[in-house]
Regions:
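Central antiparallel beta-sheet cores of small beta-barrel/beta-sandwich binding domains
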Residues: 30-32, 37-123
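Short hydrophobic/aromatic-rich beta-strand segments that constitute the beta-sheet cores
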Residues: 30, 57-59, 108-110, 133-136, ...
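Amphipathic/hydrophobic helical signal segments and adjacent flexible N-terminal regions
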Residues: 2-7, 20-23, 27, 33-36, ...
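Surface-exposed interaction patches
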Residues: 105-139, 143-147
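N-terminal signal peptide c-region/cleavage motif recognized by signal peptidases
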Residues: 15-18
Length: 174
């Protein structure tokens, strides 16, 4: 009888913990370092890599020079010219292999790609404030940190409100 009870408990609790959302999953607005204007919207999403649940990030929208969303997953046009196979910018995975470090409350050991240059860097992601996320790309001790703004889906066009990331896995273009 006790084996049946334990089986029931583990059988019902395991799926809940297995599908618990990783921190920071959601939509973020990136800001151009030089012009301080909105550049893109990135969807951070979780995916399975073997037995590990990891974090990745995909560009889901781009802004024009006036700060208006000009491209989404429905209408990508601009290409990442310096990225292998010149993919569209919208739909491009720019973050992958990010592993959660519960002690440091950050994601690390992953990669981030600059879609303009095609260069890939080590990355760390953490949060100091609830309205933004720190995203750092680095080579050794040298790097740059950007603040990404938390976006509410309801403030965005319909196409960005209910993105289904369930079958997403990063496509890495080295």
């Amino acid at each position: 009888m006790s084996i049946k009870i334990l089986s029931f408990i583990f059988g019902t609790l395991m799926p809940i913990s297995a599908f618990a959302a990783l921190p920071y999953v959601g939509l973020y607005q990136t800001i151009d370092d030089e012009t301080n204007t909105p550049k893109s919207i990135v969807q951070l999403y979780e995916y399975q890599d073997g037995d590990n649940t990891e974090l990745a990030g995909r560009i889901v929208a781009l802004y024009d020079a006036n700060g208006v969303i000009s491209e989404t997953l429905e209408n990508p046009t601009r290409v990442a010219e310096k990225v292998k196979n010149t993919p569209k910018m919208v739909g491009l995975d720019i973050i992958w292999d990010m592993a959660w470090d519960a002690d440091d409350k950050e994601f690390s050991k992953g990669k981030i790609m600059d879609p303009k240059s095609g260069k890939i860097y080590s990355s760390v992601i953490w949060q100091d404030a609830t309205d933004s996320l720190n995203v750092r790309g680095k080579i050794g001790p040298f790097g740059r940190t950007q603040k990404w703004n938390v976006m509410q889906a309801t403030d965005l066009p319909d196409i960005l409100q209910n993105i289904d990331t369930g079958d997403w896995a990063p496509t890495v273009r080295k």
